[in-house]
From Swiss-Prot:
Part of the 50S ribosomal subunit. Keywords: Ribonucleoprotein, Ribosomal protein. One of its GO terms (biological process) is translation. GO terms for molecular function: structural constituent of ribosome. Belongs to the universal ribosomal protein uL30 family. This is Large ribosomal subunit protein uL30. PROSITE patterns: RIBOSOMAL_L30. The keyword Phosphoprotein does not apply. Pfam families: Ribosomal_L30 (PF00327). One of its GO terms (cellular component) is cytosolic large ribosomal subunit. The keyword Ribonucleoprotein applies. Coiled coil: none annotated. It comes from the Bacteria. It comes from Photorhabdus laumondii subsp. laumondii (strain DSM 15139 / CIP 105565 / TT01).
Length: 59
């Protein structure tokens, strides 16, 4: 089984760059406090790095 990570949105996407909003949607995050579990892949890590100021990551 692949390793997973928990990603939680901690800041609003209002007023952010459209690319950053799209990245949150790609991660499956919809609102502040929403948590999703994603596979730990380089693609997901890249998405998290792009919006690192809006999300919290738990290994």
């Amino acid at each position: 089984m692949a390793k997973t990570i928990k990603v939680t949105q901690i800041r609003s996407s209002i007023g952010r760059l459209p690319k950053h909003k799209a990245t949150l949607v790609g991660l499956g995050l919809r609102r502040i406090g929403h948590t999703v579990e994603r596979e730990d892949t380089p693609a997901i890590r890249g998405m998290i790095n792009l919006v690192s100021y809006m999300v919290k990551v738990e290994e």
